[in-house]
Amino acid sequence: MKGYDSGAVGWIYSAYEIAAIPGTIICGIVSDYVFKGRRAITTMIYMVLVALFVFIYWQTEHNLVMDSICLIAIGFLIYGPVMLIGVHALDLAPKKAAGTAAGLTGFFGYFFGTALLANIMLGYVVDHLGWDWSFIILLGACALAFIFTAFTVREEQYLVKESTNKH
């Protein structure tokens, strides 16, 4: 990682993963209590912040403290939307299709996110085009996540309003 020794990289990566725990919990709390069940708004805010920290990390020249802050922030912020997308799909899908909605979001998230794009495609891009292009792709993925989530805002507002009127 940017020429740092393996010991420093190990600690930073551990901090990145550990930051995901409070990040995911806080994302759920923000979604439920601050935005009253509005998963899309929470996801969009988190994705903007992920993009910001990815950009800062990309542009920072060999600064262990800043790189660590960025990676911990990314770890804190990225897993919340990963969790919320499944919850969001359950909120938007008809009750009798809830299992299918959860299964499809899990499958496509794993297949295209972890198994295919994150591991194979980004490795290929780094090897053949360099790190700059990998960061451009990551920022593009953040933008796409924001845009696709934005398509659900109106339907989500309707469902939240309808749910509030029933109670």
Model-identified regions with their sequence ranges:
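Short amphipathic helix-loop junctions that connect adjacent transmembrane helices
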Residues: 1-7
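A late C-terminal transmembrane helix in Major Facilitator Superfamily
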Residues: 24, 95-128
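Cytoplasmic membrane-interface "Motif A"-like loop-to-helix N-cap segments
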Residues: 33-47
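Intracellular juxtamembrane helix-capping segments at the cytosolic ends
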Residues: 79-94
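A membrane-interface helix-boundary motif in multi-pass transporters
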Residues: 38-41, 121-141
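C-terminal ends and interior cores of transmembrane alpha-helices
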Residues: 48-62
